[in-house]
A protein has these predicted regions:
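Binding-site signature for planar aromatic cofactors or substrates
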Residues: 1-176
Length: 176
């Protein structure tokens, strides 16, 4: 992603918070000369030595999971608020633009299964069910039902290698 120097977003705690709050991302891979994309929720986890990983899963029916196993690196895009900025808002001649927040994460994927996949699903459900009335918990679901669901999923852990973040918020414009 091109990032103008004025829009470079380098505050790691803010970026991590943004990823957590905008966890419905787009996962990109490349296969047979063609890009592939899947929209999915991801779960950010801190690891020792300041490392971070993203956990996610795909339907086994989605053949993109096979690309994950073979890819040297994948791209995940997180998008936040965005808005058209009309030049009519200025008192002098100006061009319209678009303001946005975006984070691109590059990483290596490792497929997960079994207990590790179950832990991922539990963490994901717990994250989104916390504070809800009638909270759903994976532990209360029947083992036979869960086993069927797990057979239909392919889980993964993405080790974050590089992050590019842009906060394009009209930093190059004045208030008039």
């Amino acid at each position: 992603m091109y990032i103008h120097p004025l829009n470079a977003w380098e505050n790691q705690p803010e970026i991590l918070d943004f990823i957590r709050k905008n966890a419905f991302a787009t996962l990109y891979t490349q296969a047979e000369g063609r890009p592939w994309a899947t929209h999915l929720p991801l779960f950010l986890e801190g690891k020792p030595k300041g490392k971070f990983v993203l956990h996610g899963h795909l339907a086994k029916a989605n053949s993109q999971w096979k690309q994950l196993a073979q890819a040297e690196e994948v791209l995940v895009v997180f998008q936040g608020p965005h808005a058209y900025i009309s030049s009519s808002w200025y008192t002098h001649e100006n061009v319209p633009t678009w303001n946005y927040l975006a984070v691109h994460v590059y990483g290596k994927v490792r497929l997960i299964e079994g207990e590790e996949l179950m832990h991922h699903l539990k963490s994901l459900v717990d994250q989104y069910e916390t504070g809800r009335p009638n909270r759903v918990q994976v532990e209360t679901m029947s083992p036979s039902y869960l086993e069927g669901q797990l057979r239909a999923l392919v889980g993964f852990e993405l080790e974050i290698i590089e992050v590019h973040a842009s906060a394009k918020l009209s930093q190059n414009r004045d208030d008039e």
